[in-house]
């Protein structure tokens, strides 16, 4: 009988702590989009691997970018959905 190896996930690290030149800023929606699902939800830190401090800052900056219309609040609608309206 063969024993299965336990799955050990790859160690996650905070991208912002590892690279100090990568700022968390609402003016950079290209970076912030990596931390948002296709539905527009902010991805949890246990999935992204960011530290608690950077996750709080990231959440705040995403909310600022949404208020300034640099990011969507929800997912973009497809053309088929808009035709039905």
From Swiss-Prot:
One of its GO terms (cellular component) is cytosolic small ribosomal subunit. The keyword Iron does not apply. InterPro entries: Ribosomal_bS18, Ribosomal_bS18_CS, Ribosomal_bS18_sf. One of its GO terms (biological process) is translation. It comes from the Bacteria. Part of the 30S ribosomal subunit. Forms a tight heterodimer with protein bS6. PROSITE patterns: RIBOSOMAL_S18. Keywords: Ribonucleoprotein, Ribosomal protein, RNA-binding, rRNA-binding. The keyword Kinase does not apply. Binds as a heterodimer with protein bS6 to the central domain of the 16S rRNA, where it helps stabilize the platform of the 30S subunit. The gene is rpsR. GO terms for molecular function: small ribosomal subunit rRNA binding; structural constituent of ribosome. Belongs to the bacterial ribosomal protein bS18 family. This is Small ribosomal subunit protein bS18.
């Amino acid at each position: 009988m063969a024993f299965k190896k336990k799955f050990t996930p790859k160690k996650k690290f905070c991208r912002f702590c590892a690279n100090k030149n990568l700022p968390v800023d609402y003016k950079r929606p290209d970076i912030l989009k990596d931390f948002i699902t296709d539905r527009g939800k902010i991805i949890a830190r246990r999935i992204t691997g960011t530290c608690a401090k950077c996750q709080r800052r990231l959440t705040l900056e995403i909310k600022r970018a949404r208020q300034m219309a640099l990011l969507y609040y929800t997912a973009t609608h497809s053309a088929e959905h808009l035709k039905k309206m």
